[in-house]
Amino acid sequence: MKRILLLIALAVSLCHVALAQETSSPDNFPPDDTSVVLDSTNLPIVWIDVDGKTIDRYERISARMKIIHNGKGKINYGDTVAHPGQHIDYEGYIALRYRGNTSFNLSDKKPYSFRTLERPLEQGEKKKKVSILGMGKDNNWALLAPYSDRSMIRDLLAFEFARPWMEYTPQGKLCELFLDGTYYGVFILTELVTQGTHRLDLPDPGEEGDELTGGYILEVGDNDNDTTHFVSKYHPVSGDGFVTYSDCSIFFIAKFPDSEDVTDEQHQYIQSAIDRMEDVFASKNYTNPDTGYCKYIDVQSFMDYQLVNELGHNVDAYRLGAKLYKRRNSEDQRFKMAVWDMNLAFGNCKHNQGSSTSGWVSRYNSMLYSNGDPHMVPFWWYKLISDNNYVRKRFARWAEWRNSNLREARWKATVDSLANEVTCCGAEARNSQAWPRWGIKVWPNVYISTSYADEISYLKRWITNRITWLDGILQYTPPAPTLVGDVNNDGEVNIADVTDLIDILLRGEADEETMQRADVDNDKEVSISDVTALIDIILRGNT
């Protein structure tokens, strides 16, 4: 088996090299239809001007960027001459390149990385921190290119599911992109999981003492010789823990400080910190509440990372792009996690059972090994889910998620809201004109949707079925349904509810759950018609 794995790994490596050779295109990978016209849109409009230069995957080039955004709910116009005075959200120099691995190699529509600059690269790189589309000031950004994700919202959906629970989750904004005057489609302008005042607020690590202990950002993933990495002392194990795959390794890649800036002392320290954490997980007493793994990881952070990735059944979770970060010991010596890259989640991947609505991704090492996939889940995830205390806490945490932003009405409203952004002013239609792919197989889709509405329906069905499976495994019991008209939630419908409803109307505000109960006629707004409906319910005794 080891020989087979090595041969497969070699073949994958050669394939990767062959793909990676096409790091650029003289025409910058244009869409199928380059004649798309944008008159007006609800989404921000991003113009990038490279003046005919070739964009590369690894080397950045100078470019100019301009973003028109007149504000949420307002229309942005593509013709700035006919519509002068529009709000320019950002205008300036950027350092631009392509980004991504499979999202670059296996997608016709390419994603970008850019840094905002004081001046063009030719005059000496000087980064400039700016706020873009309401996101906090920074100089490091990405333009994700939804392609295999036909909904174009899976990454944003995962971010919204995780945001109330995790210390940091990237913000992202849907937009429409022009490159040298050609329409390129719908993109997501997003923050990255990087160090920064408005992102992961980590200090620069020093060379000794407490300053050496933080901050750091690591990624579990590919061994890339162009980056600073180290290998785990411990090999991955099977989903039941009985088999150790000694011919497979787990790699940690330094993301902050990056390979150009990290010193030998810092590299040695963060490797030793990972070693200490893993040594504890490998010990017999790893569940000890005082000396065990709780001392080295923020359990709730790891749990929330697990819940959002398992909710999406993300085939890349834990093993490809998993982000860990650490502050200085004087502040918090524990590792925490952040969410990133879920465009293949939520039923959007055919391989590794990615479309299944059952099963734990954290237990997939046996399948990965059988498939010859060398990228495996670190052993400490098996150890975590083998701890009864962790499992009990996960039951409770899932219930918190389900009673909050994962209530059926709320998560469906989140999907609808994001989908509406894409469709309400024609952005999806323009994107489909530029990249006509409906009814055509795109890697690695399992469901070949024929329209945007079809894709969103599939997405909702898939999430519904996945939540049903997780509810059963995580022993979640939904609360009893609220009586229609029970505005004050006391278990009865009577004149007191009318009084409370009128009070809500007069004040014009209440918490979200109360507003939902106050929407008696279920028309998505609270108005005098709800008072009429409530009185009718009381008079008829129909609750």
Which residues are covered by each model-predicted region?
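Sec-dependent N-terminal signal peptides
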Residues: 4-14
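Internal "kinase-insert"/substrate-recognition segments embedded within catalytic cores
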Residues: 118-121, 129-146, 165-170, 182-307
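Alpha-helical segments with a strong preference for the paired helices of cellulosomal dockerin domains
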Residues: 487-513, 522-543
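Short, well-structured beta-strand/strand-turn elements
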Residues: 164-178, 314
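Calcium-binding motifs, dominated by EF-hand helix-loop-helix domains
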Residues: 311, 483-487, 516-520
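Low-complexity, Pro/Thr/Ser/Gly/Ala-rich linker/spacer regions in secreted
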Residues: 21, 35-36, 472-486, 511, ...
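Conserved NTP-binding catalytic cores of kinases and kinase-like/nucleotidyltransferase enzymes
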Residues: 21-152
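Middle-to-C-terminal accessory/interaction subdomains
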Residues: 24, 43-44, 54-56, 103, ...
